[in-house]
């Protein structure tokens, strides 16, 4: 039987769920390490020569961005398409083709509001509608609204105002600062004002999310590992009722194996409260252990990057 050391979880914001830290014992860790070393060798054999190799010994930092909303641009095409490998540029803001050119436009109209994350995702199941190839509409899923907004490109500026709700308090570390490796940011809280609010209806989809980084052109390590982790979710039937998707760069590409879980709380009351849990150094062979413990309210400390509560 696997014995686990338990201690109270320390976090900058109280979670809606009750979680405890766990530490995997040495005996189990040694067995995992053997599998990890073999897997890393396999990944490194697939990487382009200019990509830094996957090193399982890199220490995982316990640091995540502070944010209020996560805006996910849905990639067109079925789950067998590979936009995460082909269409997502190294920097998504440089994409000039639809629908990805909407990301730089949206970010520009938001005026650098640091409390809003923007990523592209490619869905791996069919719980919410996805755009078709060459679709004239843009599909944005917004967390914690838990709503899908289908808008026209001409609506982006007003959609930015809607997302920002006219004003937003800036957290201490913006997502862009976080991705660029800045550990510190201004402590000053300021407001960003938009001239107009337009209400977008959206369609509600109350499901948890599993997001796996697979941004190949940002770092081939993530691009190679992401589909392997997706396959492990599917083969092991882990959280099969959750939305499952590959996501563009969320930091941590040096150690790779990055997964975000969004876990709803109080969905029966339509409260849209949820916990955001970030993990790194997740491999196909340790994913089941991570998910089973998470389902039981336990967070494996060795893979935990951090998290926040959202509502």
UniProtKB/Swiss-Prot annotation:
Biological process annotations from GO: cell redox homeostasis; protein-containing complex assembly
Cellular component annotations (GO), alphabetically ordered: mitochondrial intermembrane space; mitochondrial matrix
One protein family per Pfam: Suc_Fer-like
Domain of life of the source: Eukaryota
Phenotype upon loss of function: Increases frequency of mitochondrial genome loss.
Homology family: Belongs to the AIM32 family.
Name used for this protein in its record: Altered inheritance of mitochondria protein 32
